[in-house]
Curated annotation (Swiss-Prot):
Residues 316-331 have a biased composition (Low complexity). Belongs to the DOK family. Type B subfamily. This is Docking protein 6. Keywords: Phosphoprotein. The keyword Acetylation does not apply.
Length: 331
């Protein structure tokens, strides 16, 4: 976790070919790694002063890259070429051979996942494709300070079919914290934020966690799909338990219930889960097969509220199953 994270990998004066005139012009080029502020990219400024004051500049996003290579000296001295999968390319020339090697090395490491020993020895890494794919499945986020955690800052988020993980930005193998999806009370997003509320069953306890990110919509959709799958699994389990209860009632045998899946007590789960509960299934034995609705707190006792609804955080429901935050929470 890095609270003072710097996304600049390399910067300096280079010469870039003008598309209109076809000549090389000197400019200040900044290479930034992926972060909560944006994807991997090259930012071109007229000079170093313009970069310092963040004046008008051109941005080239570095995704779908096919190869990064050095051009022959006969073509252009000290030149580096970035080749994309659509067969387009971006070429720039450095002021020295050492600078060109530095630019090429950093671009290969960040964009292609190439390690230093791969460049020097030329040995293929059979696990590189899998590692790169896993890295691509992580989202760059900035965890805002919260009283529930003693860490904050730049990190990466991974969403699996069961959990949300935060990983260290500098060491991708260091796991910082984990939240089970089934323990989330609610979640929401906008163009620059993703936020969720955790329940008591999480390691962090109850709390509101807010992440600054440019990928809020993608994170939301992935969390939404995973929680829908959990709800469908819970639905199938409840149906199996009902069928088992009906069969055992007809045979007048004691019923053995399997362990059910815990789900959050929230409006989101209210929409996508059944209202049947273990208590309702027991009622099938003595009161026929009619079902009676139970309150959400009775259905999921582990998530019984400790405070009134008026004391809950002021979260406004969205038109979907998530929610959007009022401006007072974001600030």
């Amino acid at each position: 976790m890095a609270s003072n994270f710097n996304d600049i990998v390399k910067q300096g004066y280079v010469k870039i070919r003008s598309r209109k005139l076809g000549i090389f012009r000197r400019c200040w080029l900044v290479f930034k790694k992926a972060s909560s502020k944006g994807p991997r990219r090259l930012e071109k400024f007229p000079d170093e002063k313009a970069a310092y004051f963040r004046n008008f500049h051109k941005v080239t996003e570095l995704h779908n890259i096919k190869n990064i290579t050095r051009l022959p000296r006969e073509t252009k001295k000290h030149a580096v070429a970035i080749i994309f999968h659509d067969e387009t390319s971006k070429t720039f020339a450095c002021e020295s051979e050492l600078e060109a090697e530095e630019w090429c090395k950093h671009l290969c490491m960040e964009c292609l996942g190439t390690r230093l020993n791969d460049i020097s020895l030329g040995e293929p890494d059979l696990l590189a494709a899998g590692v790169q794919r896993e890295q691509n499945e992580r989202f760059n986020v900035y965890l805002m300070p919260t009283p529930n955690l003693d860490i904050y800052g730049e990190c990466t988020m991974q969403i699996t079919h069961e959990n949300i993980y935060l990983w260290d930005i500098h060491n991708a193998k260091v796991k910082l914290v984990m939240w089970p999806l089934s323990s989330l009370r609610r979640y929401g997003r906008d163009s620059t934020w993703f936020t969720f509320e955790s329940g008591r069953m999480c390691d962090t306890g109850e709390g509101l966690f807010t992440f600054q990110t440019r990928e809020g919509e993608m994170i939301y959709q992935k969390v939404h799909s995973a929680t829908l799958a959990i709800a469908e699994q819970h639905e199938r389990l409840m149906l199996e338990m009902e069928q088992k209860a009906r069969l055992q009632t007809s045979l007048t045998e004691p019923m053995t219930l399997s362990k059910s899946i815990s789900l959050p007590r929230s409006a989101y789960w209210h929409h996508i889960t059944r209202q049947n509960s273990v208590g309702e299934i027991y009622s099938l034995q003595g009161h026929g097969f009619g079902s009676s609705k139970m309150s959400r707190a009775q259905t999921f006792p582990s998530y019984a509220p400790e405070q009134s609804e008026e004391a809950q955080p002021p979260l406004s429901r969205s038109s979907s199953y998530g929610f959007s935050y009022s401006s007072s929470l974001i600030q």
